[in-house]
């Protein structure tokens, strides 16, 4: 389990997951590095009674069945993740090991968001390992030394409050400050340009949507 303390700069730069600079490979626009937490612009639905009774009740996405089959029990299972706060739950998810490295200080020692993410109520759009594999090695190398950029990217994947699948569509202000847009429904959900792998995954303090692409904060 990750047990490292959030650094003051990182805690101040957000109020809470996943890492992005995909467009850095294909666009000349700079990535926004304003990491001051902003209030959410769209209300988040509370966790349903059914979800609290059955952690799998809200699952959506074509990748959910495969994930559940590969992780039927233990802390990385759907039921197991529901017992832990989100950063801890992500560290137990084999599809989110790269994300865990990014938010826990392993990728960049000046960016550690574990305590922050574990301490509030959030919706997290979590890029899978396969999503990070799309990024060039040079981008990952840059994030190892650019703490401000990494914090901006990570906080762009988080919105305040837990948004259930029935309420997730629409425009949401992220903790990074910029908006992201969720369209579609259930298996066809899109988060900006990212497709849904498996969403509606509950942790003790968050609702997680695993996505297939790392999101990029828009330039400001």
UniProtKB/Swiss-Prot annotation:
Use of this protein: Could be used in vaccine production; both recombinant protein and DNA vaccines stimulate antigen-specific T cell responses in mice.
Subunit structure: Interacts with host TLR2 (tested in mouse).
Function, in words: Recombinant, non-modified protein stimulates secretion of cytokines (TNF-alpha, IL-6 and IL-12p40) by mouse macrophage cell lines in a TLR2-dependent fashion, which leads to increased host innate immunity responses against the bacterium. Serves as a strong human and mouse antigen T cell antigen during M.tuberculosis infection, inducing strong IFN-gamma expression.
Induction: Highly expressed and immunogenic during infection of mice with live bacteria (at protein level).
Signal sequence segment: 1-24
Residues bearing a lipid moiety (S-diacylglycerol cysteine): 25
One of the GO BP terms on file: cell adhesion
Parts of the chain that traverse the membrane: none
Origin species: Mycobacterium tuberculosis (strain ATCC 25618 / H37Rv)
UniProt xrefs under InterPro entries: Adhesion/Biosynth-related, FAS1_dom_sf, FAS1_domain
Pfam families the UniProt entry points to: Fasciclin
Keyword Cell membrane: yes
Gene behind this protein: mpt83
Keyword rRNA-binding: no
Gene Ontology terms for molecular function: cell adhesion molecule binding
UniProt keyword list: Cell membrane, Cell wall, Glycoprotein, Lipoprotein, Membrane, Palmitate, Secreted, Signal
Domain FAS1: 83-215
Membrane topology field: Lipid-anchor
Record PTM text: O-glycosylated. Contains 0-3 mannose residues attached to residues 48-49 in various configurations; the dominant glycoform is Thr-48(Man)/Thr-49(Man2) with an unusual Man(1->3)Man linkage, but Thr48(Man3)/Thr49(Man0) through to Thr48(Man0/)Thr49(Man3) are also seen.
Disulfide bonds: none
Cellular component annotations (GO), alphabetically ordered: extracellular matrix; extracellular region; extracellular space; plasma membrane
Intracellular or extracellular location(s): Cell membrane; Secreted, Cell wall; Secreted
Lineage: superkingdom: Bacteria
Positions of N-palmitoyl cysteine lipidation: 25
Residues annotated as glycosylated: 48-49
Designated name of the protein: Cell surface glycolipoprotein MPT83
């Amino acid at each position: 389990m990750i047990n490292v303390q959030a650094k003051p700069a990182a805690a101040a730069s957000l109020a809470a997951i996943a890492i992005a600079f995909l467009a850095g490979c294909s666009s000349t626009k700079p990535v926004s590095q304003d990491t001051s937490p902003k209030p959410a612009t769209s209300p988040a639905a509370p966790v349903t009674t059914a979800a609290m009774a059955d952690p799998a009740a809200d699952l959506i996405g074509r990748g959910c069945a495969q994930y559940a089959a590969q992780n039927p029990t233990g802390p990385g299972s759907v039921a197991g993740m529901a017992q832990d706060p989100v950063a801890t739950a992500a560290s137990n998810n084999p599809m989110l090991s790269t994300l865990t490295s990014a938010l826990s200080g392993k990728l960049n020692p000046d960016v550690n968001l574990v305590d922050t993410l574990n301490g509030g109520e959030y919706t997290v759009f979590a890029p899978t390992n396969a999503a990070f594999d799309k990024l060039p090695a040079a981008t990952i190398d840059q994030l190892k030394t650019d703490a401000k950029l990494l914090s901006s990217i990570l906080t762009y994947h988080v919105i305040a409050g837990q948004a259930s699948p029935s309420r997730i569509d629409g425009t949401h202000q992220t903790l990074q400050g910029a908006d992201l847009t969720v369209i579609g429904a259930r298996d066809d959900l899109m988060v900006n340009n990212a497709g849904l792998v498996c969403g509606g995954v509950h942790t003790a303090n968050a609702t997680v949507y695993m996505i297939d692409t790392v999101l990029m904060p828009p330039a400001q």
